[in-house]
Amino acid sequence: MKHLAMILFLITSLYSHEANCTDMFGLIYNKNLSDVETAKYIKYYIDDLGCDANMTIEIPDLSIRPNLLEYAYDANKTKTFDTLLAKGTAVNASLATSIGMSFAFFFRENGVGIDNKKASPELLEFIKNQKYKEFKEEKFKLIKKLLEHGQDPKDYKVLKIILKIINEEKDLENLLKDGAKKELAQ
């Protein structure tokens, strides 16, 4: 049923020769579409309908204008995220902030949040376990990819603060230095 609805929507868009490019934001958050399906539709909107990969959406009472890349990150649609990067969607500071905040949320979800800018003994113990190590490795791979796509290393201020609280800022500093060196070499 979801495929039929999507096909009808796309045919209607083509017939009217007008595509509402902001629909890409809805496609990304559509829980009925897999990541692979979403990436396919996003590619179609950009390549065939001429939508801008760098479009943003205005949200009242919010000073930033999130882009498609941020939506794909928040929806945890990695294939869609990679498709957007390949289509030239710009990385921005608010995406880096979201990545930093995801560390704080991850700690809180695991019952070991940061309180009053201090790491509890439980948090310091938690960061030794495999679950955290895998989470950190996944996020650092993402950061490396974003640096390769032009992310400014200075955008990771929030993450630096969080990692400093748990005495892990050196790993990030090394990653950001390596990314900056590659940027200078290009």
Predicted segments with their positions:
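Ankyrin-repeat C-terminal turn/loop position
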Residues: G50-C51, G88-T89, V112, Q151, ...
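Ankyrin-repeat boundary/"N-cap" motif
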Residues: A19-N32, N54-Y71, N92-N129, D155-K164
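Ankyrin repeat structural motif
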Residues: D35-D47, N76-L85, F107, G113-D115, ...
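N-terminal export/targeting and maturation segments
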Residues: S16-Y44, H149, K181
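Classical Sec-dependent N-terminal signal peptides that target proteins to the secretory pathway
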Residues: M1-E18
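Terminal, low-structured helical/coil segments at or just beyond the last alpha-helical repeat
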Residues: V158-Q186
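Extended alpha-helical scaffolding segments
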Residues: N129, K133, I143-Y156
